[in-house]
Amino acid sequence: MIIDRKITPYIILDTEPIRNALQKINANEEGLIICVNSSGLLLGVLTDGDFRRWIIESSQPDLEKPVEEIVNQNIISAKVVDSPRSIAAKLDQQVQFIPLTDNEGRCVAIARLRNSQILIDHHKIGNDSQYMITETCW
């Protein structure tokens, strides 16, 4: 499990348009975004699946609507002061990210399953990668 306090790529304000949420979720390459209000209070999470379901269920999807209108409030979260063991127990293949809040309910970090990929420059190398790293002695 990794606890990351650099959460800006995963955060969107509830008043921002859905279009911005889609752009952020695309940029962070993790398949989700955490919705907070102007005080940083956790309101919900939006995943790729939430967006797809919203598009399918909407007769006329409006990307300029505020994110708060489609946020999934049925989320799993934990307190940042909880034990690592109790936080890790909430993570599995279905739940790979958990927002962590302070005592006031503000999102201050995320917990996620350890990424099996190695990031080198802008390249992700993982178990399914067809890359090989070699050592050179120039």
Q: For the regions a protein language model found, what residue spans apply to each?
A:
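N-terminal nucleotide-binding beta1-loop-alpha1 segment
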Residues: 115, 127-138
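N-terminal positively charged helical leader segments and presequences
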Residues: 50-54, 58-69
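Short beta-to-alpha loop/turn elements within the nucleotide-binding domains of ABC transporters
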Residues: 16, 46, 65, 82, ...
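A short, flexible N-terminal coil/short beta segment enriched in small residues
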Residues: 39-40, 45, 135-138
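Bateman (tandem CBS) regulatory domains
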Residues: 1-10, 64-75, 131-133
